[in-house]
């Protein structure tokens, strides 16, 4: 008799476990469908529109071939080839301390140029970068499984100087792979390589950027806007970073182009205002028009965005379940 009851209790627990797993699978599938629907615009599906490069790793490689001897950072006297070499050395150093491709790496706090080099070194390995901003590493480790912490005892330049500038890639990330996990918002924002590339491409088209343009931008290191406008944009467009006599400036205020986060006032933005929605990677509209392959609707209490720059989702699927609706992503004011 005891055996009978134990058997049926175990059988019931097994059925409950299988049922919960099945429901979880259905929810995951439903959320993925919602996110994919939000990332489509018209009949153009995400990744169907080809960006010039298939990943951030390929971006740095391709731009170095195009602009190898061109100055990339006049402040630090660094050419595109110098930058590329630093990135390769960084990847070799990361590999030497046990970092593996596909891992998530928590970015340490570094100054702008070192952060930019480390970020591309992480991408070059096929890893994803975590920006914790005001969150403690302990807090991140509680929420992210197997997040790797990188610590430096001296400057990045001193740390990597003995490593080879030839790096053999063990993993080449796909456009759809995660490139960034940012905790700029408590819920955690996931961005793919495609998100980053398509958003920067949209900014380039909207502003009409030309290579060799002297450019300056001074944003908070580690913010999503810093990643897009200060870390990637100069590399993507072949710009020259210069704070003495820039031809183009981008910043929070008083610049040629100003970043505006107050989306409830988007209808009143000036022609040189860039509407920022970090759930849409960064740029949403410039000069009153949505950037290429992005669109939005104004709601009473927020904005619904859709298009190829729409993020991979929040870290928490329960939030995704609510936020992704009606073939879009709702962001509250």
Q: Where on the chain are the PLM-derived regions?
A:
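Conserved ATP-binding/catalytic segment of the ANL
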Residues: 304-333
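Short beta-strand->loop structural element characteristic of the AMP-binding/adenylate-forming
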Residues: 106-108, 115, 119, 123-161, ...
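Conserved AMP-binding/adenylate-forming
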Residues: 74-77, 92-134, 214-224
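N-lobe entry segment of adenylate-forming
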Residues: 2-96, 149, 161-179
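Conserved pre-ATP/AMP-binding loop-to-beta segment of ANL
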Residues: 29, 33-34, 65, 69-70, ...
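Gly/Ser/Thr-rich phosphate-binding loop
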Residues: 237-240, 247-307
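Conserved AMP-binding/adenylation subdomain of ANL enzymes
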Residues: 197-214, 220-257, 262, 270
């Amino acid at each position: 008799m005891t055996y009978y009851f134990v058997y049926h209790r175990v059988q019931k627990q097994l059925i409950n476990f299988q049922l919960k797993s099945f429901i979880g699978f259905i929810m995951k599938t439903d959320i993925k469908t919602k996110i994919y629907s939000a990332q489509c615009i018209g009949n153009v599906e995400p990744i169907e529109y080809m960006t010039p490069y298939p990943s951030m790793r390929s971006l740095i490689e391709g731009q170095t071939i195009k602009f190898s001897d061109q100055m990339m950072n006049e402040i630090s006297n660094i050419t595109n080839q110098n930058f590329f070499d630093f990135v390769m050395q960084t990847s070799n150093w990361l590999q030497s301390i046990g970092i593996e491709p596909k891992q998530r790496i928590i970015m340490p706090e570094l100054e702008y140029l070192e952060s930019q080099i480390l970020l591309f070194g992480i991408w070059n390995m096929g890893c994803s970068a975590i920006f914790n901003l005001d969150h403690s590493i302990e807090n991140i480790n509680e929420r992210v499984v197997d997040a790797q912490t990188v610590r430096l005892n001296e400057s990045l330049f001193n740390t990597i100087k003995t490593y080879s500038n030839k790096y053999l890639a063990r993993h080449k990330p796909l456009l759809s792979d995660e490139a960034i996990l940012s905790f700029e918002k408590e819920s955690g924002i996931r961005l793919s390589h495609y998100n980053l590339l398509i958003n920067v491409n949209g900014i380039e088209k909207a502003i009409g950027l030309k290579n060799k343009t002297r450019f300056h931008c001074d944003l908070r290191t580690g913010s999503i806007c810093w990643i897009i406008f200060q870390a990637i944009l100069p590399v993507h467009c072949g710009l020259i970073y210069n704070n003495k006599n820039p031809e183009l400036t981008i910043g929070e205020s008083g610049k040629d182009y100003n970043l505006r986060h107050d989306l409830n006032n988007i209808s009143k933005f000036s022609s040189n205002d860039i509407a920022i929605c970090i759930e849409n990677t960064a740029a949403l509209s410039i000069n009153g028009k949505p950037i290429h392959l992005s669109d939005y609707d104004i709601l009473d209490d927020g904005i619904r965005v859709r298009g190829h720059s729409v993020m991979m989702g929040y870290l928490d699927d329960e939030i995704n379940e609510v936020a992704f609706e009606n073939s879009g992503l709702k962001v509250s004011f």
